[in-house]
Amino acid sequence: MRHCPTQAIRIRGSKAIISEELCVDCGTCISVCPSGAIVPITDPVAELSHFKYKVIVPSPVLYSQFESNIHPYIVHLALKKLGFDEIVDVGLSSAALGRALVKYMKKCQGRRPLISSHCPSMLRLIQVKYPDLVELVVPLDVPREVTAKEIRTSFPDKLGLKSEDIGIIYIAPCPAKIVSIKQPAEKARSWFDGVYSIKDVYSVLLPQIVAIKEGFTEKDVPKNFSFNAGWATLGGMTRTVEMENWLAVSGLDHVMKILDDIENSKLRNIDFVEALACMLGCIGGKFNVESPYVARTNSIKQRVKYENRIEIKDEEIEENLKGGYYFIENPILPRPTIYFDTDLETSIKRMKEKERVYKKLRQIDCGYCGAPTCMAFAEDYVRGEVNLTDCVFLAQKGEKGG
């Protein structure tokens, strides 16, 4: 309960209740829950078997879960052994969006620094806890969605199949990316048909990789095979776009300190902030198998050994920017909460009532009431969710109230 960065968890009737409006899908609760009570929902493999042609889009993090001497093409071959017809990486989209980001920032005049929209958990955090910073979030879509859009628009003609016969599946490193596909907030629906976590596929993928590696040589790699580590690690985005005045930060506690600084008009000398919820970036995702530090080392070595530089025509980037191809469909807006009201007078009354109740409390954040802090309890009272006597200290005093 106390680990949740947005205080979205309450204990009611001996059960953990998660507030959907406050949850940012960071997955912290999944990793710290001692009984494993919180479980993410992914798609069973059998549910996607009806597609005539199945395309898998792996997160670049997947490659880092294996030793650096495992060629990325071996991972592709292993995925095909699992029944996928084609594997498409996000490297091309990452490179294109990196170039598009630079062009967007040059044209975008005004408040700084701008903030990346790459991490869905960070986007939700800003919408919930830092609504004044929403205007600073770069409204460019993410590499996985742009990749899936390319597949959806080009593969039907290429394969001679109907769009609905082609299944596009993502392999995700974290809960936030799963939710962003199953319940996208900034678009009507995701371009993906399904999503697996890295944990879902790792145990069945590893034996295939071990078997394929025996006797495999780099001569077996097709000449047209391309590998790009993309934005898997912290700093990957800023490395791709080759910026000067940037800041890369990871981990929710660290990110919130930076967002506090931005909200207080600090960091004005910074043009861009790459903010990621998981420590060290996506390689620290809750659904990964390997230690993030080992995975980071693997990713760096793989990048040095196998990565190809991707060339994209400048005219293509300009055309896609002007046509809105790279942008998120819907505007990024603050997420409304039931604590505040659209009516200013009502909101002020609620804030005053919250302060009045908070002053009555012991302010020791014991958590016995089922709220993570005394301030959270006061907010719950204002919302009409608890009674004052739910606080054990006020109950001992015989305090009356709602």
Residue positions per predicted region:
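Iron-sulfur-associated redox domains of electron-transfer enzymes in respiratory
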Residues: 39-367, 372-402
